Amino acid sequence: MNWLEERMPGIGRIAKDIAEHPVPSHTLNIFYCLGGLTLLCFIIQCLTGVFLAFYYKPTPEAAFASVQMITNEVRFGSVIRSMHHWSCQLMILLVFLHMLRVYYTGAFKKPRELNWVAGCFLLVLSLGLAFTGYLLPYEQLSYWASVIGAETANTLPVIGPTLKIMMQGGIKVTAEMLSRFYVLHVMILPAITIGFLVAHFIMIRVQGISDPM
């Protein structure tokens, strides 16, 4: 730390402030850990997702075969894919439970309204990550689920038809749908999610943790 302090003055103070920052005694229970557990699941998905991206091929001809290769041939591939899958399921559950806790304890009220809004966006982004990832194995179930999702988007007022075309890559389902979902899943949505997470944690640090009801 002294070596870093000489080259980056103030970093020791920042590290000490983070490590020794006090938290209210009422937060020392599992219900106040739901947000942190959600973040842990997101980190697991990022790490396992990088591993999966080394082998996955986002084309209609090769997508399913590459997933099968990861599962059956790549060393620890089945374990990594399972970790990615189940951390996603757990993350969605934890996001809902975290928001229920925040709502029940009134932690969304003034002056934390913007943090609540950021949390709502994070919920939508989490669902978007789950939905776009579902198509990537490109099997019958995931294909038709994505078609249904595009048709559901089509029912939105004003922007629905345009959104459907953007998702499908045309009037009908095309090969572009897979590549677009892949880019959304591994680049755009994670980047936006990280941005909202940073804002979320900054607001928590500035405003502090809310008092119990």
Curated annotation (Swiss-Prot):
Subcellular location, record wording: Cell membrane
Pfam families in the record: Cytochrome_B
Listed InterPro entries: Cyt_b/b6_N, Cyt_B6_PetB, Cytb/b6-like_sf, Cytochrome_b_N_euk/bac, Di-haem_cyt_TM
Biological process terms in GO annotation: photosynthesis; respiratory electron transport chain
Annotated residues for binding of heme b 2: H84, H185
GO cellular component: plasma membrane
Cofactor note: Binds 2 heme b groups non-covalently with two histidine residues as axial ligands. Binds one heme group covalently by a single cysteine link with no axial amino acid ligand. This heme was named heme ci.
Complex formation: The subunits of the cytochrome bc complex are a Rieske Fe-S protein (PetC), cytochrome b6 (PetB), subunit IV (PetD), and a diheme cytochrome c (PetX).
Descriptive protein name: Cytochrome b6
Keywords: Cell membrane, Electron transport, Heme, Iron, Membrane, Metal-binding, Photosynthesis, Transmembrane, Transmembrane helix, Transport
Recorded family membership: Belongs to the cytochrome b family. PetB subfamily.
Role according to the record: Component of the cytochrome bc complex which donates electrons to the photosynthetic reaction center.
SUPFAM superfamilies: Transmembrane di-heme cytochromes (SSF81342)
Cofactor(s) needed by this chain: heme b; heme c
Additional notes on this entry: Heme 1 (or BH or b566) is high-potential and absorbs at about 566 nm, and heme 2 (or BL or b562) is low-potential and absorbs at about 562 nm.
Gene responsible for this protein: petB
One GO molecular-function entry: metal ion binding
Binding site for heme c: C33
Listed transmembrane segments: 30-50, 88-108, 114-134, 184-204
Membrane topology label: Multi-pass membrane protein
Chain positions recorded as heme b 1 binding sites: H98, H200
